[in-house]
């Protein structure tokens, strides 16, 4: 969102030391589909892959006709993925390489029309440009326009931030759930981007950044 401050000083950084379980990093060029699936299951990242229709966790025994990824979010106050993922080019590329191993068809990557940034430079995916207002960034809308799901077919989708986390697993051999989110809305004193670890306490992100409320006022905090 254009109203969200992008200063590096605005990014919340978790100070505690993190420890990680180490996983063997497979050679993607040589690894079998079964090895890829096994690592995603063992690491706990498999639920990031969602099946359409029905919007349920993908069945690892299925082979989808395609994988769809939306590289932008058209919802109000949504983060600018070109900004929050600006340091994740390598992980995004590896994530796409992983997705290619999981489908017998194509990996479809949807970007904003005339968008600048790194998304269009990613290789191994068929890129589609979309223009218009929300919900044009929703992957379901994009599937409908690119390659609709017919009776008996399944496709898989993965959120672009989750794709970077999957790529990070295959590049670094660990599950690092760090991501950047947008903190914004009418009751936020200073809209900003925050670097967090998934599962962070909401009060640690919002502390001191919610406008003073009058007695009887209620502030609703929404994630998503």
Regions inferred by a protein language model and the residue ranges of each:
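Buried, small/hydrophobic-residue-enriched core segments of structured protein domains
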Residues: 3-5, 9-224
């Amino acid at each position: 969102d254009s109203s969200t401050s992008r200063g590096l000083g605005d990014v919340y950084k978790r100070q505690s030391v993190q420890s990680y379980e180490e996983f063997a990093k497979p050679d993607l060029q040589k690894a079998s589909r079964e090895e890829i699936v096994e690592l995603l299951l063992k690491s706990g990242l498999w639920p990031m892959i969602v099946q359409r229709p029905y919007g349920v966790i993908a069945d690892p025994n299925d082979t989808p006709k395609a994988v769809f990824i939306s590289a932008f979010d058209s919802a109000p106050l949504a983060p600018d993925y070109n900004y929050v993922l600006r340091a994740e080019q390598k992980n995004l590329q590896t994530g796409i390489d992983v997705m290619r191993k999981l489908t017998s068809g194509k990996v479809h990557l949807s970007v904003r029309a005339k968008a600048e940034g790194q998304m269009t430079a990613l290789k191994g995916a068929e890129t589609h440009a979309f223009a218009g207002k929300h919900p044009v960034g929703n992957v379901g809308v994009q599937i409908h326009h690119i390659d609709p799901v017919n009776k008996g077919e399944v496709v898989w989708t993965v959120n672009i931030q989750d794709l970077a986390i999957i790529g990070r697993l295959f590049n670094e051999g660990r599950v690092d759930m760090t991501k950047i989110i947008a903190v914004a809305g009418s009751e936020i004193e200073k809209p900003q981007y925050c670097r967090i670890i998934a599962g962070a306490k909401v009060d640690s992100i919002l502390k001191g950044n919610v406008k003073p409320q009058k007695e009887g006022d209620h502030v609703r905090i929404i994630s998503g």
